[in-house]
C-alpha cells in the first residue's frame, strides 16, 4: 500500500455537508484495509483565483495509506460529487502524521488571541493623573 495526501475544495454552500462526506471517504478507505494518518479541516478560506465564479471554498486535508483500487474509487467519487469543486491527490514516500503548517499557524493565532487582553473600558481616558 502507498501513502497519499489528498486536498479537497468543497463548495462553500455545501460546508455543512463536509462532515458527512469526510466520514464516507474515511469509511471507504478503512473498509478496504487502508489507514487514515492525518485529517485536517481547514475550514472556509479565500481562493487564490475564482473557480466557476466561486471565491471561497471549504478545505479538507487527508493523509492516507491505501491501495490503487481504493484511490481510483475515491478519485471517481470526487470527480462526480458536485459539491467538490477541486481535488488534489499527491503520492507521498512516507506517512505524514504531524500537524500541517497551516494548522500550526491557526493554533498559534488562536493562542495569541486568547492571551491578549482587551483594555479596560473604564481606563479609556488616557489620563492617569488624579486631578483633585
UniProtKB/Swiss-Prot annotation:
Gene3D superfamilies, alphabetized: 3.30.70.60
Any one GO BP annotation for this protein: translation
Disordered, as annotated region: 94-132
Database matches in SUPFAM superfamilies: Ribosomal protein S6
GO CC aspect terms: cytosolic small ribosomal subunit
Compositionally biased tracts (Acidic residues): 122-132
Gene Ontology MF: a single term: small ribosomal subunit rRNA binding
Superkingdom, taxonomy of origin: Bacteria
Keywords linked to the UniProt accession: Ribonucleoprotein, Ribosomal protein, RNA-binding, rRNA-binding
Family, per entry: Belongs to the bacterial ribosomal protein bS6 family.
PANTHER family, per database record: MITOCHONDRIAL 28S RIBOSOMAL PROTEIN S6, SMALL RIBOSOMAL SUBUNIT PROTEIN BS6M
Function: Binds together with bS18 to 16S ribosomal RNA.
HAMAP family: Ribosomal_bS6
Protein name from the UniProt record: Small ribosomal subunit protein bS6
Record organism: Psychrobacter arcticus (strain DSM 17307 / VKM B-2377 / 273-4)
Organism lineage: Bacteria, Pseudomonadati, Pseudomonadota, Gammaproteobacteria, Moraxellales
Amino acid at each position: 500500500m502507498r501513502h497519499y495526501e489528498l486536498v479537497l475544495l468543497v463548495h462553500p454552500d455545501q460546508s455543512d455537508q463536509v462532515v458527512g462526506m469526510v466520514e464516507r471517504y474515511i469509511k471507504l478507505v478503512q473498509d478496504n484495509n487502508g489507514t487514515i494518518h492525518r485529517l485536517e479541516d481547514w475550514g472556509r478560506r479565500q481562493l487564490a483565483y475564482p473557480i466557476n465564479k466561486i471565491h471561497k471554498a471549504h478545505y479538507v486535508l487527508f493523509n492516507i495509506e491505501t491501495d490503487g483500487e481504493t484511490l481510483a474509487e475515491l478519485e471517481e467519487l470526487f470527480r462526480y460529487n458536485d459539491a467538490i469543486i477541486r481535488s488534489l491527490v499527491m503520492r507521498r514516500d512516507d506517512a505524514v502524521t504531524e500537524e500541517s503548517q497551516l494548522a500550526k499557524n491557526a493554533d498559534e493565532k488562536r493562542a495569541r488571541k486568547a492571551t491578549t487582553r482587551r483594555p479596560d473600558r473604564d481606563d479609556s481616558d488616557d489620563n492617569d493623573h488624579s486631578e483633585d
